[in-house]
Amino acid sequence: MKLLVLICRLIQKKSVCIRFGNDYDAKCENIVSLQGGIIAWVKCCRYLGVFFVSGRFFKCCFDHAKCSLFSSFNSIFGKVGRFASEEVVISLLKAKCLPCFLYGLEVCPVIMRDKRSFDFYITRLFMKLFRTGSAAIVEQCQKHFDFLPIRYVIDIRTASFIERYLESTNQICMLFKQRAASNLQIIFSNYGNTVCSSNSLKTIINTSFFG
């Protein structure tokens, strides 16, 4: 019995309630357990490393991911700084910083405004690295060092994820296959009528950006 009470207390400390939909801003009473613990309603919560924000529609908050990107980059740049070449710093950025930044984005609703914001943050990092204030120079540096803009990376990762999702035989996943297929076609349609897979999408994007 004591073990059960302890487990319940641990669950309560890690649990919150969040609302999505038309009544997302309606005031709700906190949930009280049999042991007297309170599970509060919140406007933002973290689940599996992804931050959800209460709203009329399901949406995510990427502020933590942006902070993690800057924190990890500044940590690396502060140690290697001007001692390492730009190529080495960018390789470290790809290997150590981007995985944390891109974590879970392929399954999150990312709108174009978010993608532009992500590209802006990467541009700022490149400006710091190459000591320039020109976005045009940053773009040329990205092409030279084989660094694809984040908006394209997200589309490729999302398309690849949806393709794997559509192949799943999980009964719950199958309930949303039609919606997933529709989202995949929307991504493909943004890059022309010849795109039919994530591989062809990647090829077209690389050809278009890198030339």
Residue ranges and their predicted role:
Residues M1-V5, F20-Y24, S54-F58, V110-M112:
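Catalytic palm subdomain of template-directed nucleic-acid polymerases
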Residues L3-Q12, M127-I137:
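Short helix-interrupting loop/turn segments at helix-coil junctions
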Residues C8-C44:
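Short, conserved micro-motifs composed of acidic
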Residues L34-P109:
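Basic, alpha-helical interaction scaffolds
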Residues S134, H144-G211:
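Acidic catalytic cores of enzymes that act on phosphate-bearing nucleotides/polynucleotides
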Residues L3, S117-F126, T158-F161:
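Short amphipathic alpha-helical coiled-coil/interface segments
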Residues Q12-K14, V88-S91, G104-I111, A136-Q142, ...:
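Short coil/turn segments at secondary-structure boundaries
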